[in-house]
Amino acid sequence: MPTRQRIVQVCLFLLAAIGIFGGTVQMFLGQPDTTARLDNVHRFMAGVYLGTGIISLWAGITIRRQDTLVYLLALGVLLAGIGRLISISQVGLPQPAAVWLGYLVPELLLPVIMAAAQLTTRRRMAPLPPAAA
């Protein structure tokens, strides 16, 4: 397996671990000290988080057959990070700040790493055009 494809695979497994663990925990814990509406949205998003983790695991296992799915997963994670940035700009950084920044940094970096590595893998594995006679 090419190194760049292995990088994508490791990123997918990392997303899978975070999504499966985080989604499961949030599904059971819910949103503490809140309204029914916010808890409902929180647990719904925990299901999306868990589902994305499972899809990422499958994509990592079947990485040699994946292309567009890698970009779509990267986009989803990037959009989640952007959502977190918007929240921080609108209502402030939750405490402890280091924890929330620890979530944000991978949400912004992993998608870029995944997309760049997938793009270079795709280019290297693309068949060469036929030679002119």
Would you name each region that the model predicts?
Residues 1-16:
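Cytosolic juxtamembrane helix and N-cap/initiation of the first transmembrane helix
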Residues 60, 82-102, 119:
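Membrane-helix boundary connector in multi-pass membrane proteins
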Residues 108-133:
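Membrane-water interface at the C-terminal end of transmembrane alpha helices
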Residues 71-85:
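Hydrophobic alpha-helical membrane segments
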